[in-house]
Each structure stands twice: as C-alpha cells, then as structure tokens.
C-alpha cells in the first residue's frame, strides 16, 4: 500500500512529538536531530540524515546545502531549536525545496513550545517561475534592440 503525502507527514509529526515529549526544551539542535533520526528509523520510516544537495544556477553547480533529514525521499525536514520560528527559517526551507525535486518540507522547532510549519513548492510553480524569467529576459532583449 502506498502512503499519501498526508500519511507521510503525519508519521513524521508523530515522531517529532514523541521526541519533543521525551527530551523537552533546552538542548541544541543537533541533539534533537539525532534523536528524531533515530526515532524515524525505529519506526521503519526511510530517512537520510545530512544529505548534501547541489544547488544549480543555469545548469551549473554553484554550491550545496546539507539538509537536516530527508524522509521517504519526498519530504525535507529542517529542524530548529529556537525560541520562535521566523520568516527567515521558512524561507530557508522554501529555498531547499526550490533546489530539489522535493515538493514538501516540514520546519520543526524544538522550542519552548513545539512548532511545525509545512511548506509546499510545486514543480508547477517552479516551471512558471522559469517561464516568467525567460519571458522577462526576452522582453529585455527585445527592448534593447
């Protein structure tokens, strides 16, 4: 039986809450990352910790980032241990999604109160952004003539 994206994110969120309830607030991010990774494995949820993801600019690798955890090969987890999630944290996750073929990301904060933010970046929007960029570039080259 194939899991839906909602089933996958529910399983991840349940593991997140188990780790949060066990450890509580106050540890550094790496402790939570290791604990969540182990909890996902314990539940037989396929995941990879710290995978390096190439970032491309015009089909050339210009750098990479290291994701915290990728689950089911279809959900990026970005973990934080901060007082409160910020817009910058959300943008970081969206950029990670843009750099991959993965469309769903979860921002999980092990703060004073557990916080979860779900982000989706569809390939449809990626293609639309690329088409808009190409249209803008065409318009610029036409106007320069």
Predicted regions located by residue number:
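Nucleic-acid nuclease catalytic cores
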Residues: 80-138, 142
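A short acidic/basic microdomain associated with nuclease active sites
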Residues: 41-59
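Structural motif corresponding to alpha-helix initiation and N-cap regions
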Residues: 63-64, 90
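Residue-level signature for short turns and capping positions that connect secondary-structure elements
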Residues: 54, 62, 76, 82-84, ...
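Conserved catalytic cores of phosphodiester-cleaving nucleases, focusing on short active-site segments
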Residues: 24, 47, 67-85, 96
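Solvent-exposed, charged helical/coil patches
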Residues: 1-46, 114, 120-145
């Amino acid at each position: 039986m194939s899991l839906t994206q909602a089933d996958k994110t529910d399983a991840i969120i349940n593991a997140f809450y188990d780790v949060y309830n066990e450890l509580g607030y106050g540890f550094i991010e790496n402790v939570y990352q290791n604990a969540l990774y182990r909890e996902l494995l314990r539940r037989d949820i396929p995941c990879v910790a710290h995978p390096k993801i190439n970032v491309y600019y015009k089909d050339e690798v210009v750098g990479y980032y290291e994701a915290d955890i990728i689950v089911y090969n279809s959900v990026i987890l970005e973990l934080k241990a901060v007082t409160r999630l910020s817009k910058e944290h959300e943008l970081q996750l969206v950029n990670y999604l843009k750099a991959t073929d993965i469309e769903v990301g979860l921002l999980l904060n092990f703060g004073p109160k557990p916080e979860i933010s779900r982000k989706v970046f569809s390939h449809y929007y990626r293609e639309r952004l690329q088409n808009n960029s190409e249209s803008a570039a065409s318009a610029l080259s036409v106007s320069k003539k």
